[in-house]
From Swiss-Prot:
Superkingdom assignment: Bacteria
Co-factor remark: Binds 1 Mg(2+) ion per subunit.
Record SUPFAM superfamilies: Phosphoenolpyruvate/pyruvate domain (SSF51621)
GO MF terms held by the record: 2-keto-3-deoxy-L-rhamnonate aldolase activity; magnesium ion binding
Subunit structure: Homohexamer.
Gene name of the record: rhmA
Cellular-component GO terms for this entry: cytoplasm
Protein name per its UniProtKB record: 2-keto-3-deoxy-L-rhamnonate aldolase
Length: 267
């Protein structure tokens, strides 16, 4: 296989190795490159809740390419045209949000594969993914290098988790704590005892099925707990939240009445 098509992130997931990541919501190549120099195993470039265009995603992929941190792209949704664009700009690993059923999971898998194995549109000669046609036999090799992760973040998805885990081509399942807690009736309270119990059970089910389990936890104790439950790819922070907290902390050093950083959000 061409060296440009190797996917060390996927290979480490196959081996069950733990990989620590960072969420990127700042939408700039400059910030993405700074994060890539820090040494995280993977970087999630967010196109769901961060206002990233395809061109923004493209520039961030370029910015992190020289470094060891592996980029994971989360598009706003899992439609076939959007997945095609994200793969063509060079993403090797995708995290697809809001996958509730096995049928949805199969559709996402199909969107990432060229015919006859799927429905990905053919355009390698004009795509960064194939280095504009310079990677020989790209279509024959690329499937093995793609890593497909799906998000389970609703009660419906939990009810269908075993069927989703049975779908061939799904490499890992990521638990979305914020949406999941809201769907379970505990909005903005992913730390609720019942939500935590369900998260633990789900992680163990995912690993028992031979898939990788993922999570985003901005609180260090929650990240450690997820690792203890068996999660093997964990994002331990969000760049915009870390930046915001650092600003608050620095200001609190010089202005009275400031209480310092707070953990913001549902993660």
């Amino acid at each position: 296989m061409n060296a440009l098509l190797t996917n060390p992130f996927k290979e480490r997931l196959r081996k069950g190795e733990v990989q620590i990541g960072l969420w990127l919501s700042s939408t700039t190549a400059y910030m993405a490159e700074i994060a890539a120099t820090s040494g995280y195993d993977w970087l999630l470039i967010d196109g769901e809740h961060a206002p990233n265009t395809i061109q923004d995603l493209y520039h961030q992929l370029q910015a992190v390419a020289p470094y060891a941190s592996h980029p994971v792209i989360r598009p706003v949704e899992g439609s076939k045209p959007l997945i095609k664009q994200v793969l063509d700009i060079g993403a090797q690993t995708l995290l697809i949000p809001m996958v509730d059923t096995a049928d949805q999971a199969r559709q996402v898998v199909s969107a990432t594969r060229y015919p006859p194995y799927g429905e990905r549109g053919v355009g390698a000669s004009v795509a960064r993914a194939a280095r504009w046609g310079r990677i020989e036999n790209y279509m024959a090799q690329v499937n093995d290098s793609l890593c497909l992760l799906v998000q389970v973040e609703s009660k419906t998805a939990l009810d269908n988790l075993d069927e989703i885990l049975d779908v061939e081509g799904i490499d890992g399942v990521f638990i979305g704590p914020a949406d999941l807690s809201a769907s379970l009736g505990y909005p903005d309270n992913a730390g609720h005892q019942e939500v935590q119990r369900i998260i633990e059970t789900s992680i163990r089910r995912i690993r028992a099925a031979g898939k990788a389990a993922g999570f985003l936890a901005v609180a260090p104790d929650m990240a450690q707990q997820c690792l203890a439950w068996g999660t093997n790819f964990v994002a331990v922070g969000v760049d915009t939240m870390l930046y915001s907290d650092a600003l608050d902390q620095r200001l609190a050093m010089f202005k009275s009445g400031k209480n310092g950083p707070r953990v913001k959000g549902s993660y």
